[in-house]
Design a protein with these regions (language model features):
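Conserved alpha/beta-hydrolase "acid-adjacent" motif
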Residues: 309-314
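Histidine-bearing beta->alpha loop at or near hydrolase active sites
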Residues: 331-344
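Gly/Ser-rich "nucleophile elbow"/oxyanion-hole loop immediately N-terminal to the catalytic nucleophile
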Residues: 47-48, 108-128, 144
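Short beta-strand element of the alpha/beta-hydrolase
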Residues: 50-59
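N-terminal cap/lid segment of alpha/beta-hydrolase-fold proteins
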Residues: 23-48
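Accessory cap/linker subdomain of secreted extracellular hydrolases
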Residues: 154-290
Length: 360
């Protein structure tokens, strides 16, 4: 797995920063610092080609330790070897931090360009959740970029993503009610949100093992393998609960949703738990996490084969949005490569970036 699967609106406040090391001339020049609570680093190769890559990392669960100074993303070395300068932010918050990340990356872009002085072209490259950051940036701040790349990206509007996560949780609760080790109120409940990720995963995995035929049916509907299903469900629960905390309540509901593809759909729709959205939270995902498809700079999208996190139904969303927005001329979807979530090697990352610069 290549990058981390983890994935402030005022004037930039730049804290003093120091070089990480007095490097020999043959090694990249590295500096680091903090901008309004977001740690950052900037790496510049000795043979810099004059181009800057703003690298947006993926989802990082709340509470994961953050080393200081900020370590480089796994793909940094390959980009530096290809001649690009790489700027990356740790973001001011953890979790589904798309809204924070857009602002953190913009502050860092301003600083990086002022430090580098002579930047010929600027790109934004995002992995996983960072893919949504990259695309939202190209939609909202196109004047600062020549184009961008979303790799293994969660390229969905926030409301659509949250609805997808909710579907996963209520489907599990329907097929596995009162599972041992899990709250009787279900995976959407506050009690489920209070569980540790390990306890949540273990309870889900045990329930799925108790009814393998039903688990296989659910895996097919959710477009993941049976082996990946426990991790996918627990991940969806973690992200939805964190998003609800960030947004001020459950951001989506299913009071009128008609579900399909769960076997006896009539029984499923009659028996599935129903939830109402919180208006404030709904406004948050519709505003802060919106994606419209109206990309205004060249955008390259690429996924991996058999990705249990960004499954085919999710992969199709942004191209459809771009088509409705009349922006398909700026969008290039490359064939899937690698396996799993964010299974890219350095050369594939560089080639995707070069594709963004190629004539459409």
């Amino acid at each position: 797995m290549r990058p981390r699967f983890r994935l402030a609106l005022a004037v930039a406040l730049l804290l003093p920063h120091t070089p990480l090391s007095a490097a020999p001339a043959a090694t990249p020049r590295t500096s680091s610092g903090e901008l309004q609570g977001a740690r950052w680093r900037l790496d510049v190769p000795t043979g810099w080609n004059g181009e800057l890559v703003m690298l947006a990392h993926g989802y990082e669960p709340v509470g994961v330790p953050q080393p200081s100074p900020m370590p480089a993303n796994d793909s940094t070395a390959g980009l530096l070897a290809a001649g690009y300068a790489v700027a990356q932010s740790a973001y001011a918050s953890q979790g589904w931090a798309v809204a924070d990340a857009i602002n953190d990356m913009e502050r860092l872009r301003t600083h990086a360009q002022s430090e580098l002085k002579d930047v010929h072209r600027t790109w934004i490259l995002g992995f996983s959740m960072g893919g949504a950051v990259a695309i939202a940036t190209l939609e909202r701040l196109p004047q600062h970029y020549n184009g961008g790349v979303s790799l293994c990206g969660a390229n969905l509007p926030g409301e659509q993503l949250a609805n997808d996560l909710l579907t996963t949780l209520v489907a599990f609760d329907y097929f596995f009610p009162e599972a041992e080790g899990l709250p009787r109120q279900g995976l959407v409940s506050a009690d489920a949100a209070a569980l540790s990720q390990m306890a949540l995963y273990q309870g889900i995995a045990a329930a799925l093992q108790s009814r393998p035929a039903v688990a296989a049916q659910l895996a097919t509907r959710l477009q993941v393998s049976a082996e990946a299903l426990p991790g996918t469900i627990s991940l969806h629960a973690m992200i939805l609960h964190e998003l609800a905390t960030r947004a001020g309540g459950m951001p989506v509901g299913n009071l009128r949703t008609v579900y399909r593809g769960f076997g006896d759909d009539k029984a499923f729709n009659a028996g599935v738990q129903r939830h109402a959205p919180v208006a404030l939270a709904q406004r948050y995902v519709r505003g802060k996490l919106a994606l419209t498809g109206a990309v205004k700079r060249p955008l390259v999208i690429q996924f991996n084969n058999n990705d249990p996190s960004i499954v085919p139904r999710m992969q199709a969303v942004y191209p459809q949005l771009a088509e409705r927005a009349g922006a398909t001329s700026l969008l290039r979807v490359l064939p899937a490569v690698g396996e799993g979530h964010c299974g890219f090697v350095d050369s594939q990352v560089v080639e995707a970036l070069k594709a963004a610069a190629a004539p459409l």
